């Protein structure tokens, strides 16, 4: 015959309740810990580990080939931007950056992807100084870049005398004016890291191309299994961000094509996120 035994109700309050809760969580985690994490679990042989790694690689490659629209987190870019802008309302403009992150699937030992993106709409304003004694190039540069410092020997003399302050971020020059820069303003530009040099790639006869690439260029490099790069600010228009995303896609694919490997990396799922917003999957194919 079964008998009913009354169990006294224990009420735990205050710090003890919190400790009890965390202790229960720990016990639950210990009881249901996967066998592979247990100290008594047998270690895998080299062949077993290799097969497991190969299986995971096949799974990641299969996932990379799935269309972005299959993800429950997918949104068209314009709709995703609306949500991300909403998440940044009230934040300082300096923190309202739209980031693009692309997962990279590759075999072990494959070199990480790297390169640079030239954005149609740069994320920040960069002031540039260009030095050349070629009058035709000076005229061309002054017409194309009126808001930047463009000049020859006269500009070098003004920097040397302190008439013009060194408030620019980058400097470029043609080979004909490099000796004057080295002899007159190297001690001024060098410590600030803006002295043009062949080693840095800031000296060229085609100075116009250097300026064009530098004004909107942003380097990227694969970290771990992903590439992350800023593609805009929340106050950019949808069109400006879309153009920057297209440029990033072209640069990523160029980096993949330039890989010297029989089995190059594959670009997988891509998400858009903001500084304080969620990650939203977009179509990056």
From Swiss-Prot:
Its main location: mitochondrion. It holds the Pfam family Ribosomal_L1. One of its GO terms (biological process) is mitochondrial translation. One of its GO terms (molecular function) is RNA binding. The gene is MRPL1. PROSITE patterns: RIBOSOMAL_L1. It comes from Saccharomyces cerevisiae (strain ATCC 204508 / S288c). GO terms for cellular component: mitochondrial inner membrane; mitochondrial large ribosomal subunit; mitochondrion. InterPro entries: Ribosomal_uL1, Ribosomal_uL1-like, Ribosomal_uL1/biogenesis, Ribosomal_uL1_3-a/b-sand, Ribosomal_uL1_CS, Ribosomal_uL1_mit. Keywords: Mitochondrion, Ribonucleoprotein, Ribosomal protein, Transit peptide. This is Large ribosomal subunit protein uL1m. Component of the mitochondrial ribosome (mitoribosome), a dedicated translation machinery responsible for the synthesis of mitochondrial genome-encoded proteins, including at least some of the essential transmembrane subunits of the mitochondrial respiratory chain. The mitoribosomes are attached to the mitochondrial inner membrane and translation products are cotranslationally integrated into the membrane. Present with 7000 molecules/cell in log phase SD medium. Residues 1-19 form a transit peptide. It comes from the Eukaryota. Belongs to the universal ribosomal protein uL1 family. The lineage of its organism: Eukaryota, Fungi, Dikarya, Ascomycota, Saccharomycotina. Component of the mitochondrial large ribosomal subunit (mt-LSU). Mature yeast 74S mitochondrial ribosomes consist of a small (37S) and a large (54S) subunit. The 37S small subunit contains a 15S ribosomal RNA (15S mt-rRNA) and 34 different proteins. The 54S large subunit contains a 21S rRNA (21S mt-rRNA) and 46 different proteins. NCBIfam families: rplA_mito. It is found in: Mitochondrion.
């Amino acid at each position: 015959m079964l008998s009913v035994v009354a169990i006294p109700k224990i009420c735990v309050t205050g710090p003890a309740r919190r400790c009890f809760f965390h202790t229960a969580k720990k016990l639950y985690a210990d009881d249901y810990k996967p066998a592979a994490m247990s100290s008594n679990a047998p270690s895998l042989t080299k062949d077993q580990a290799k097969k497991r790694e190969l299986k995971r690689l096949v799974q990641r490659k299969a996932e990379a080939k799935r269309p972005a629209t299959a993800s429950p987190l997918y949104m068209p870019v314009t709709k995703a931007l609306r949500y991300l802008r909403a998440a940044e309302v009230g934040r300082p403009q300096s923190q309202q950056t739209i980031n693009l992150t692309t997962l990279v699937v590759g075999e072990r030992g494959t070199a990480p992807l790297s390169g640079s993106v030239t954005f149609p709409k740069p994320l920040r304003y960069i002031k540039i100084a260009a030095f050349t004694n070629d009058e035709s190039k000076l005229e061309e540069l002054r017409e194309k870049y009126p808001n930047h410092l463009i000049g020859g020997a006269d500009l070098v003399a003004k920097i040397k005398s302190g008439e013009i302050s060194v408030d620019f971020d980058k400097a470029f020059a043609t080979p004909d004016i490099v000796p004057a820069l080295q002899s007159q303003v190297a001690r001024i530009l060098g410590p600030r890291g803006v002295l043009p040099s062949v080693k840095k790639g800031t000296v060229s006869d085609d100075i116009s191309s250097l300026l064009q690439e530098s004004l909107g260029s942003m380097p990227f490099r694969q970290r771990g299994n992903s590439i992350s790069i800023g593609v805009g600010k929340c106050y950019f228009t949808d069109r400006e961000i879309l153009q920057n995303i297209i440029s990033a896609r072209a640069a990523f694919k160029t980096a993949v094509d330039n890989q010297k490997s029989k089995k190059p990396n594959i670009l997988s799922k891509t998400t858009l996120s903001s500084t304080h917003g969620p990650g939203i999957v977009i179509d990056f194919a």
